Design a protein with these regions (language model features):
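Metallo-beta-lactamase
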Residues: 1-100, 108-120
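Metal-dependent catalytic neighborhoods of phosphoester/phosphodiester hydrolases
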Residues: 122-132
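Acidic, His- and aromatic-enriched active-site or binding-groove loops in soluble protein domains
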Residues: 133-137
Length: 137
């Protein structure tokens, strides 16, 4: 996503993971396969990779900078979270790099807003440091 401004507020984002990921039947197990195929045929490559029969999934964090505050919206998957299985076990360095590329440090964040509490929206809210879970922000 290209950064944009609304008045004196800057909105940008950075990605933890982006690309073909899971088959449609895994994401929507109760859907009718024939109906799903008809809809998938209409989807652009940014949403569905037909060659691999995989939905494209993007995990990203939005950064809202106001003159007074830095706000994060959703904190992606995070690291070392128990019970998530290998499907969410991918390198998280891109998220850390994205944070740095925005010139941000964890202590620069004033507010974190999670749109909802699924694992891919609140993962970096905490980090495992020295065997203990600590708040990231």
């Amino acid at each position: 996503m290209r950064p944009f401004t609304v008045g004196d507020i800057l909105v940008s984002s950075f990605v933890e993971r982006d690309g073909p990921w899971r088959p449609p039947g895994v994401m929507f197990p109760t859907s009718d396969p024939a109906t799903a195929r008809a809809h998938l045929a209409e989807m652009p490559p940014a949403v569905y990779d037909a060659a691999q029969d995989l939905l494209v999934i993007t995990y990203q964090t939005f950064v809202v900078r106001t003159p007074k505050h830095n706000i994060l919206i959703d904190t992606c998957v995070g690291e070392h979270k128990p019970g998530r299985g290998p499907v969410l076990d991918f390198s998280k360095q891109s998220w850390l790099d994205g944070f740095a590329a925005h010139g941000l440090r964890f202590e620069d964040i004033d507010y974190v807003f999670c749109t909802h509490l699924h694992v891919d929206h609140c993962g970096w809210n905490t980090r495992l440091i020295g065997g203990k879970w600590v708040p990231t922000f």
